[in-house]
Amino acid sequence: MNQHRYLRAYMAGIVAPTLFLLVVLAVFCIARFGLKVPAPIEQVIVFPMAIMPNVFGLWNILYVKLQPHWHTPIGLHGALLPFILAPFGFFTASSLGLVKITNGGVLYFNALYVPYGLLVFVPLIGIALYYLVWKYIVGSLNALVGLK
């Protein structure tokens, strides 16, 4: 089963973020349209829904491509992805005016203020979550489609 190796890697990679973003979209739609919660998240949800699954798929293709030469665990490979996505996402959000840096913290959507002391934990939590998703979900899907 060595045919279409990279296509199988791409498809195994897009499953986790696609399912997660579908749940996020469903919760948002229920809150926004059913409960009439004023949440302006529709301005920013389209971009991640288009980009994130593709990034995960391409990152998994890179993992499969590098595996014969660079033997890293898939969890570690996935934990490296936030180091690329976080600066890109922060730059995009701040250039669109969705995130503002203040003297004492960061202001999201002109509604949610997070002090710098709490922001220390965000990268650690993000890296840990990516590690677990890649180790247990993407790794299992890679094994399921015969990639390892």
Model-flagged regions — what are they?
Residues 4, 8, 39, 43, ...:
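Juxtamembrane/transmembrane-helix boundary motifs in multi-pass membrane proteins
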